[in-house]
Amino acid sequence: MAEIFLTIFFISVLLFFLGSGIWVALSMIGVSAIGMMLFTSRPVGDAMATTIWGTSSSWTLTALPLFVWMGEILFRTKLSENLFKGLSPWMQKLPGGLIHVNVVGCALFAAISGSSAATVATVGKMSIPELRKRNYPEKILLGSLAGSGTLGLLIPPSIILIIYGVAVQESIAKLFIAGIIPGIMIAIIFMSYVIIWSLINHKDMPKIIEKYTFLEKIKRSGQLLPVIILILSVIGSIYTGIATATEAASLGVVGALILSYFQKSLNLDTFKSSLLGATKTSCMIAFILAGSTFLSLAMGFTGLPRNLAVWIQNMNLSPYVLIFVLMIFYIILGMFLDGISAVVLTMAIIEPMIRQAGFDMIWFGIFLVIVVEMAQITPPVGFNLFVLQGMANKDMGYIARSAFPLFLLMVLAVIIVVVFPEIALWLPEQMVKNIN
């Protein structure tokens, strides 16, 4: 029963700190310090200093600010406008019309951003006014944008996959490559839903189709070519083993700066604002990660993760039941915490359980990110809902209801990934073979 008491103690103190308005990172450090002072004889100060320094000086973590900066640079370019202009001629004849621009546009921007909120904001900045002008139904317009924006967490480069990789000491390159096929699969599921919805509600869909010759389509899409080359360069360099995730991130930043320069959107103000935005985001994430690592150390000293893993093992839960319980747990947790906090707060306890159950940690990372994606469109703390609320001038309840079908489709995606784990594992296996 000791492990149950310790679990309740840690959770209670953490919730108290969080409820008091203390920063997430400071809350985790505070819980860790109290736990070590009460239940171990280890010196708290030395352990905290060593752990936080070790986490902050991690070479693997270097990829984080670089990928964040790449997204910040491109967020300030004409990419939003180019995405709509380049994709709309190809999408308009599909059932669902230009709604597909939301899905494909989010998938493309996700491949250079790594942030769900930035993906929604960038694509929505152009698509919302354009689709409203063409009288597309608000429900499918906002729902598709909210759901598709979550691809920013899964399709590489993904900030949350970097954090997960650092937390469980798994290869970030493998995690990035593992997210490609599930990300494309979810995008296809969303597009299929848009097609079915539009066929059922065909009376509500606009009938206007702008005519383009094939050469006009190619010309309008040409503006997306530099972005596609940048995406292929970053992901391709990781897959072929030419570059590590950190080196690929450096390549991405240089490419983003060059692209921004030639689009005439790079000046001293945009350079400074992108750098400042990346610094703020990266410092916040690194601080949370440092607190999480110290919490993991403190729990390790108390023996809590090991004892919980043994306790779970003695319950004789089947692996699928454990995964189902964790899915419900993370959905509920995601209703109150952002995705990054949900991951770093729980990995110290969850990781031993997953390893004990025999799951591949690369596969579990993809599973976890998809579930955390679902939380991005669930109230009351669904970040994508807040972003859309500000852009669309609709109440939170309406946007959440519009996004709910996409939430159910993501549940379907989780089931598919659980039943067919090779969807996430095949590409990393091929990558290892190519490198060797």
Annotate each predicted stretch with a short phrase.
Residues M1-N436:
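Alpha-helical transmembrane segments of multi-pass membrane transport proteins
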